[in-house]
UniProtKB/Swiss-Prot annotation:
Top enzyme category: lyase
UniProt GO molecular function: magnesium ion binding; phosphopyruvate hydratase activity
Organism lineage: Eukaryota, Fungi, Dikarya, Ascomycota, Saccharomycotina
Enzymatic reactions: (2R)-2-phosphoglycerate = phosphoenolpyruvate + H2O
Native source organism of the sequence: Debaryomyces hansenii (strain ATCC 36239 / CBS 767 / BCRC 21394 / JCM 1990 / NBRC 0083 / IGC 2968)
CDD domains: enolase
Name the UniProt record assigns to this protein: Enolase 1
Bound cofactor: record note: Mg(2+) is required for catalysis and for stabilizing the dimer.
Record pathway: Carbohydrate degradation; glycolysis; pyruvate from D-glyceraldehyde 3-phosphate: step 4/5
Length: 439
């Protein structure tokens, strides 16, 4: 079977910015994918092609990427006669058609839209669920599927929210839950208590949510945010049963070799900027005082020494996740492994640009006993393919925002459906989230 039609258009993401949607048609029907977009992006990410015309969409249009699908990728892919079930062959074809290391010719957003739509078509051609098709092409174990711990971003700061809080994400992780559905229920209950506490302490407007559905009160310090979350966990009746994870996104406030925790203030006091060692001391204090099990991007992607110095101090206690550091790219994952900088990969398909490359990035991380956390982007859509990716790749952990905003819930609801479909053929990763490959 082959692809008979490929068509792209622009639609809007959860921020109201244009993004690329791709339809791939085969004899089995039409298969659609929508590409997400990030706000805090790594400098080494694959090239997202934007129009740059400031008179429209503030320069964020994607008509060039859409045209690249319709005028270049579509005719070449249809003419190739490639089978939609062969994901690696099609992704390789797309990479050759682009011909650049970072996909700047056609745009990673154009290429990824086609790659993901093809994956859906491939699953339909095999008459299997998408997660099973992904498990097949990644050669993941299928005796029992692993359902992930939902890392839920319940309090937003950094570039995802107003207020002066520097750290970008404060997540809850119900690792002690007996199942995914129970983990989601626990997370939802904690979230509602957090909203109530936030409003009562900071005023009604503090219950307004950030880009990823978490509350975004005007909090200044991470301790204040963590105290609020711990109080919410206790109020919900889950003291000692729900863990906490951070995405610091520290590259966002890395300036002149130091870290400015007051980076949203244009007149921040330079004498208060922290060195890598001072920031590490802050993390160690937080780890000692709160139930933190994972920290993402604790240092800038340019500050490799800080990562390598921090790793031996805390790696036995928690997961250290590379996002901006590794950008789902084997080159940077290998470097992080060699430098002993991290022990987990944040997997974002749009950082690298094809499903096949994403799978290979995960496999490289697994080969060094790293954990892998599948992730959404802050500019999301109703597409829920990452739910199938996290189950198919058996990574055991996903972050896709708070239990709020339908573009976030789309992914979590899809995992609920998969859980129900699999029944006893699936296990919840729980406390084994970091080593889910071994479950």
């Amino acid at each position: 079977m082959t692809i008979s039609k490929v068509h792209s258009r622009y639609v809007y993401d959860s921020r109201g910015n244009p993004t690329v949607e791709v339809d791939v048609t085969t004899e089995n029907g039409l298969f659609r994918a929508i590409v997400p977009s990030g706000a805090s992006t790594g400098i080494n990410e694959a090239m997202e092609l934007r129009d740059g015309d400031k008179s429209k969409w503030q320069g964020k249009g994607v008509t060039k990427a859409v045209d690249n699908v319709n005028k270049t990728i579509a005719p070449h892919l249809i003419k190739s006669g490639l089978d939609e079930k062969n994901q690696e062959e099609i992704d390789s074809f797309l990479l050759k058609l682009d011909g650049t290391p970072n996909k700047r010719s056609l745009g990673a957003n154009a290429i990824l839209g086609v790659s993901l739509a093809v994956a859906k078509a491939g699953a339909a051609a095999k008459q299997v669920p998408l997660y099973r098709h992904i498990a097949d092409i990644s050669k993941s174990k299928q005796d029992k599927y692993v359902l992930p711990v939902p890392f839920q971003n319940v309090l937003n700061g950094g570039s995802h929210a107003g207020g002066s809080l520097a750290f970008q994400e404060f997540m809850i992780a119900p690792t002690n839950a007996p199942s995914f559905s129970e983990a989601l229920r626990i997370g939802s209950e904690v979230y509602h208590h957090l909203k109530s506490l936030t409003k009562s302490k900071y005023g009604q407007s503090a219950g307004n949510v950030g880009d990823e559905g978490g509350v975004a009160p005007d909090i200044e310090t991470p301790e204040e945010a963590l105290d609020l979350i711990v109080a919410s966990i206790e109020k919900a009746g889950y003291k000692g049963k729900v863990s906490i994870a951070l995405d610091v996104a520290s590259s966002e406030f890395y300036k002149d070799g130091k870290y400015d925790l007051d980076f949203k203030n244009p007149n921040s006091d330079k004498s208060k900027w922290l060195s890598g060692d001072q920031l590490a001391d802050l993390y160690e204090s937080l780890i000692d005082n709160y139930p933190i099990i994972s920290i993402e991007d604790p240092f800038s992607e340019e500050d490799w020494d800080a990562w390598s110095n921090f790793y031996p101090k805390v790696a036995s206690k928690l997961q250290i996740v590379g996002d901006d550091l590794t950008v789902t790219n084997p080159i940077f994952i290998k470097k992080a492994i060699e430098k002993k900088a991290a022990n987990a990969l944040l997997l974002k398909v749009n950082q690298i640009g094809t499903l096949t490359e994403s799978i290979k990035a995960a496999q490289l991380a697994f080969s060094d006993k790293w954990g892998v956390m599948v992730s959404h982007r802050s500019g999301e859509t109703e597409d829920h393919i990452i739910a199938d990716i996290v189950v198919g790749l058996r990574t055991g952990q996903i972050k896709t925002g708070a239990p709020s905003r339908s573009e976030r819930l789309a992914k979590l609801n899809q995992i609920l459906r998969i859980e129900q479909e699999l029944g006893d053929d699936a296990v919840y990763s729980g406390k084994g989230f970091h080593t889910a490959q071994n479950l």
